[in-house]
Amino acid sequence: PFDYLAHAFFEVRDFNSAAAAPPPNHTADCVVWAARGSGKTFLAALATLLDLLFKPGIQIKLLGGSLEQSRRMHEHLRRLFDSPALAPLLAAPITSRRVTLKSGSVAEVLAASQTSVRGSRVQKVRCDEVELFDLDLWRAVQLTTRSMPLQGPWGDHVRGCVEALSTLHEPGGLMSRIVDESAPATRRVFRWGVLDVLAPCPPAHTCDTCIIHDDCQGRIKQRDQRPASAHGFISIDDAVRLRSRVDRQTWESEMLCLRPNRSRTVYPMFDPAIHVVPAPTAGPPPSGRFFAAMDFGFVGEAAVLLARLDHHGTL
């Protein structure tokens, strides 16, 4: 999560590099693939707060899969400005759609519609729960940003960028497509699951009877040097309750962020690491009958599934 915050604020600047400035051709676009309830909406609001405070004149649009989703990020932002140290920076009272600072910085909630998106020319668009977006709307968002001259640790200008935040749960869905297309030169991907944002595991909680031990393997207790008062986004007790309510596939998809949920696919047990093999080398073919099934690929590439039935009847 902190890597996302650093990227959102410093944009393409890499402080682990000896270079004095970021490469000019790098993009600030990024994708956040994170578990449900793991703080991605709050962190996007926090990134928006930092931009508003330290990048005078910046224009930011908050766009959700629904207007209600957009307002959730806006509500986080409103609560952050309740701080006595920040409230005097406001140029006007925060409305249900807009935050305006005396510096000229503005953050505004957008309705998830073509009309509102196409009329925008801003520095940053933060798209929450992009899995729920219509594809045409997502395409329209890509043409809404522009850079702004402003010297800072991010370089000599603030880069126009689009951020996509969501849980990836639909195979072949929009978020899956965005992640697949996100080569290093186009978008940086940040991914975290429930184990990355758990609150400290109390000593009274035993691993032997813990329903999430198969995933955790005791690592939370081993790594946790935080004080007991530290806060995560999800408590151990809540994580245990959530795990007890769902099947393994849903847990891996929506909470561990390992892969999309395949429960509605034809072959949910298919695993590329196991079932995708190189073409056989020349030589006598193994005995048995061969079968081939073809998917012409409405969403992805066409694929052929090969199977052999040996003389024992094993497929």
Residue ranges and their predicted role:
Residues 201-294:
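ATPase catalytic-site recognition across NTP-hydrolyzing enzymes
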Residues 25-47:
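Walker A/P-loop
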Residues 101-102, 286, 305-315:
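Nucleic-acid-processing active sites and adjacent nucleic-acid-binding tracks
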Residues 128-129:
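Walker B catalytic acidic pair
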Residues 1-30:
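Conserved pre-motif I regulatory segment
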